[in-house]
Protein backbone atom coordinates (compact mmCIF):
# COMPACT_ATOMS: atom_id res chain seq x y z
CA UNK A 1 0.00 0.00 0.00
CA UNK A 2 2.95 2.37 0.48
CA UNK A 3 3.38 2.63 -3.28
CA UNK A 4 -0.20 3.87 -3.53
CA UNK A 5 0.94 7.13 -1.93
CA UNK A 6 2.15 8.00 -5.43
CA UNK A 7 -1.39 7.39 -6.77
CA UNK A 8 -3.64 9.34 -4.36
CA UNK A 9 -6.88 8.66 -6.25
CA UNK A 10 -6.28 4.91 -6.08
CA UNK A 11 -5.36 5.13 -2.39
CA UNK A 12 -8.41 7.23 -1.51
CA UNK A 13 -10.74 4.84 -3.35
CA UNK A 14 -9.26 1.87 -1.48
CA UNK A 15 -9.51 3.61 1.88
CA UNK A 16 -13.12 4.65 1.26
CA UNK A 17 -13.96 0.99 0.57
CA UNK A 18 -12.28 -0.12 3.82
CA UNK A 19 -13.42 2.72 6.04
CA UNK A 20 -16.97 1.59 6.84
CA UNK A 21 -15.87 -1.92 7.82
CA UNK A 22 -12.88 -0.71 9.85
CA UNK A 23 -15.01 1.89 11.64
CA UNK A 24 -17.41 -0.86 12.72
CA UNK A 25 -14.46 -2.67 14.31
CA UNK A 26 -13.02 0.50 15.87
CA UNK A 27 -16.38 1.34 17.46
CA UNK A 28 -17.79 -2.12 18.18
CA UNK A 29 -14.68 -3.98 19.32
CA UNK A 30 -12.50 -1.22 20.76
CA UNK A 31 -15.17 1.25 21.89
CA UNK A 32 -13.36 4.12 20.19
CA UNK A 33 -14.77 6.90 18.03
CA UNK A 34 -14.90 6.04 14.31
CA UNK A 35 -12.97 8.15 11.82
CA UNK A 36 -14.65 10.53 9.40
CA UNK A 37 -13.59 10.78 5.77
CA UNK A 38 -12.47 14.39 6.39
CA UNK A 39 -10.08 13.18 9.13
CA UNK A 40 -8.63 10.51 6.83
CA UNK A 41 -8.29 12.90 3.89
CA UNK A 42 -6.63 15.58 6.05
CA UNK A 43 -4.14 13.01 7.34
CA UNK A 44 -3.42 11.82 3.78
CA UNK A 45 -2.91 15.35 2.51
CA UNK A 46 -0.44 16.26 5.26
CA UNK A 47 1.34 12.93 5.78
CA UNK A 48 1.75 11.45 2.31
CA UNK A 49 4.26 14.02 1.12
CA UNK A 50 6.34 13.55 4.27
CA UNK A 51 6.40 9.76 3.83
CA UNK A 52 7.05 9.53 0.07
CA UNK A 53 10.83 10.23 0.20
CA UNK A 54 11.31 7.16 2.39
CA UNK A 55 9.56 4.69 0.07
CA UNK A 56 12.01 2.52 -1.81
CA UNK A 57 12.83 -1.04 -2.77
CA UNK A 58 13.96 -2.21 0.66
CA UNK A 59 15.34 -5.44 -0.74
CA UNK A 60 17.71 -3.53 -3.02
CA UNK A 61 18.64 -1.14 -0.21
CA UNK A 62 19.44 -4.02 2.17
CA UNK A 63 21.34 -6.02 -0.46
CA UNK A 64 23.47 -2.96 -1.14
CA UNK A 65 24.14 -2.54 2.59
CA UNK A 66 25.05 -6.22 2.91
CA UNK A 67 27.40 -6.07 -0.08
CA UNK A 68 29.12 -3.06 1.52
CA UNK A 69 29.69 -4.91 4.78
CA UNK A 70 27.20 -2.91 6.80
CA UNK A 71 25.46 -4.40 9.82
CA UNK A 72 21.71 -4.87 9.48
CA UNK A 73 19.36 -4.95 12.46
CA UNK A 74 15.85 -6.39 12.20
CA UNK A 75 13.44 -5.57 15.00
CA UNK A 76 10.07 -7.17 15.67
CA UNK A 77 7.24 -6.94 18.11
CA UNK A 78 4.79 -9.47 19.48
CA UNK A 79 5.87 -12.73 20.97
CA UNK A 80 6.26 -16.20 19.56
CA UNK A 81 2.82 -17.20 20.79
CA UNK A 82 1.25 -14.65 18.41
CA UNK A 83 3.09 -16.08 15.37
CA UNK A 84 0.78 -17.32 12.62
CA UNK A 85 2.49 -20.73 12.38
CA UNK A 86 3.93 -21.25 15.88
CA UNK A 87 1.46 -19.35 18.06
CA UNK A 88 -1.74 -20.34 19.84
CA UNK A 89 -4.32 -20.30 17.05
CA UNK A 90 -6.77 -18.56 16.70
CA UNK A 91 -5.16 -15.96 18.97
CA UNK A 92 -2.40 -15.24 16.45
CA UNK A 93 -1.66 -12.22 14.34
CA UNK A 94 -1.95 -12.39 10.55
CA UNK A 95 1.79 -12.73 9.94
CA UNK A 96 4.94 -14.37 11.21
CA UNK A 97 6.67 -12.88 14.25
CA UNK A 98 9.52 -15.41 14.35
CA UNK A 99 13.04 -14.04 13.74
CA UNK A 100 13.64 -16.35 10.78
CA UNK A 101 10.94 -14.52 8.81
CA UNK A 102 12.48 -11.04 9.24
CA UNK A 103 14.84 -11.31 6.25
CA UNK A 104 12.09 -12.75 4.05
CA UNK A 105 9.69 -9.94 4.89
CA UNK A 106 12.38 -7.31 4.33
CA UNK A 107 13.27 -8.45 0.83
CA UNK A 108 16.66 -9.79 1.90
CA UNK A 109 15.70 -13.45 1.96
CA UNK A 110 19.29 -14.66 1.65
CA UNK A 111 20.36 -12.98 4.89
CA UNK A 112 22.12 -15.10 7.47
CA UNK A 113 21.04 -14.29 11.01
CA UNK A 114 24.15 -14.62 13.13
CA UNK A 115 22.67 -13.13 16.28
CA UNK A 116 19.09 -13.33 17.55
CA UNK A 117 18.42 -11.41 20.75
CA UNK A 118 15.29 -12.42 22.64
CA UNK A 119 13.95 -9.54 24.71
CA UNK A 120 11.81 -10.56 27.68
CA UNK A 121 9.95 -8.13 29.89
CA UNK A 122 10.19 -8.77 33.62
CA UNK A 123 6.44 -9.35 33.55
CA UNK A 124 4.00 -10.72 30.98
CA UNK A 125 1.38 -8.80 29.05
CA UNK A 126 -1.41 -9.86 26.76
CA UNK A 127 -3.44 -7.76 24.35
CA UNK A 128 -6.90 -9.09 23.63
CA UNK A 129 -8.39 -12.48 24.28
CA UNK A 130 -6.76 -15.88 24.50
CA UNK A 131 -5.00 -18.06 27.02
CA UNK A 132 -2.87 -16.27 29.58
CA UNK A 133 -1.94 -18.80 32.24
CA UNK A 134 -0.21 -16.38 34.59
CA UNK A 135 -2.71 -13.52 34.43
CA UNK A 136 -3.01 -11.43 37.58
CA UNK A 137 -6.18 -9.72 38.76
CA UNK A 138 -7.17 -7.12 41.32
CA UNK A 139 -5.05 -4.53 43.07
CA UNK A 140 -1.70 -6.20 42.32
CA UNK A 141 -2.51 -6.29 38.60
CA UNK A 142 -3.56 -2.64 38.69
CA UNK A 143 -0.29 -1.61 40.32
CA UNK A 144 1.73 -3.51 37.72
CA UNK A 145 -0.35 -2.12 34.86
CA UNK A 146 0.12 1.44 36.14
CA UNK A 147 3.86 1.03 36.76
CA UNK A 148 4.41 -0.33 33.26
CA UNK A 149 1.97 1.98 31.48
CA UNK A 150 0.24 -1.07 30.06
CA UNK A 151 -2.65 0.50 28.17
CA UNK A 152 -3.56 0.29 24.49
CA UNK A 153 -1.95 3.11 22.49
CA UNK A 154 -5.08 3.77 20.43
CA UNK A 155 -7.92 2.72 22.72
CA UNK A 156 -6.44 3.23 26.16
CA UNK A 157 -7.79 -0.17 27.16
CA UNK A 158 -5.89 -1.84 30.00
CA UNK A 159 -3.65 -4.71 28.93
CA UNK A 160 -3.76 -8.01 30.77
CA UNK A 161 -0.69 -8.45 32.99
CA UNK A 162 1.06 -11.10 35.05
CA UNK A 163 4.45 -12.38 36.15
CA UNK A 164 6.95 -13.65 33.60
CA UNK A 165 6.07 -17.14 32.35
CA UNK A 166 9.31 -19.09 31.92
CA UNK A 167 7.62 -21.97 30.09
CA UNK A 168 6.32 -19.60 27.42
CA UNK A 169 9.68 -17.83 27.40
CA UNK A 170 11.55 -21.11 26.87
CA UNK A 171 9.22 -21.99 23.98
CA UNK A 172 9.86 -18.55 22.48
CA UNK A 173 13.62 -19.01 22.77
CA UNK A 174 13.37 -22.39 21.02
CA UNK A 175 11.19 -21.34 18.08
CA UNK A 176 13.02 -18.02 17.65
CA UNK A 177 16.45 -19.66 17.72
CA UNK A 178 17.58 -16.98 20.18
CA UNK A 179 21.32 -16.80 20.71
CA UNK A 180 20.93 -14.59 23.78
CA UNK A 181 18.24 -13.27 26.11
CA UNK A 182 17.85 -9.81 27.61
CA UNK A 183 15.52 -9.41 30.59
CA UNK A 184 14.02 -5.94 30.83
CA UNK A 185 13.06 -4.06 33.99
CA UNK A 186 12.65 -5.03 37.60
CA UNK A 187 8.93 -4.60 38.25
CA UNK A 188 8.25 -8.26 39.01
CA UNK A 189 11.52 -9.53 40.44
CA UNK A 190 9.71 -11.66 43.02
CA UNK A 191 7.16 -13.37 40.73
CA UNK A 192 8.25 -15.97 38.22
CA UNK A 193 5.88 -18.64 36.91
CA UNK A 194 7.31 -22.04 36.02
CA UNK A 195 4.15 -23.88 34.91
Mark where each language-model region is.
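Non-transmembrane, aqueous-exposed alpha-helical and coiled segments at domain scale
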Residues: 1-195
Amino acid sequence: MAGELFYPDVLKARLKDLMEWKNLIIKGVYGAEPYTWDEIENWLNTSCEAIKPFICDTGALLRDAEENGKKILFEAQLGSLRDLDHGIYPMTTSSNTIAAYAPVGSGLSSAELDRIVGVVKAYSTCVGEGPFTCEMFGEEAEKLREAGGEYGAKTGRPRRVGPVDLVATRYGVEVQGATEIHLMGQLMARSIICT
